[in-house]
Amino acid sequence: MHTFTSRMDVLPAEQRQVLRLLGPTRSMGFVLYGGTAIALRLGHRQSVDFDFFSSRPLDKEAIRKSLPFIARATTLQDRPDTLTVLTKSNVKVSFFGSINFGHVEEPEQTNDRLVCVASLPDLLATKLKVLQQRVEAKDYEDVAAMLRAGVGLGVGLAAAAKMFAPAFQPAEALKALTHFQGGDLQRLSTKEKQSLIQAASAVRQLPAVTLRSDLGLEAGAFVQSQMPPAYTQSQPSTAVTKKPRQGPRMSI
């Protein structure tokens, strides 16, 4: 599995402390998604919680055994395939199981081998879906940061369309990226708004992407790959292309 240099420096001290305890999540099949995953990759903003996804059913006892600080934390939500806790240092950590929306690029480990983080195309796809569920400036900031990093908006839209069909409609996401109304969107800078409008206006046709049927941490996931991930175009693949079952609705 490839590694990347994480931007741990943007995290609050309490969150950095928790991150150093999360090493066992890799062998348990968890991949980090959400704002903190994007922040670790790009360092563009602070994000104060952790959202871990797994294709496997959630084994809460195994989580508590492998991560003792989770057992000592305050439980905020405990239901099938979902566990959310608040640590003693007030950091929220969530685990979601049976997430079967798939992935289009392989996750990577942080260079300190602490956690596995979803690829930028997959993070963009999930953020584009979130735009249809809520109106929060941080989600638009995340999308703008990933576009600045070179992720193609068309790739993110195509991935989201495959991952979340039929609920996700690319046209609705494009509309959201050009109309900034509601919530706290007044926080967005003029530059961010202009970049989002420009990117949305440039989309003409969605590229072909190959959807793999898990989150990338199944058996053999830690074998070193010889091919680096491509963030702006899809690569030929022999992976399964059928649409996987969707996991539970969530905001990330």
Describe the role of every protein-language-model region:
Residues M1-I252:
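Compositionally biased terminal segments of proteins
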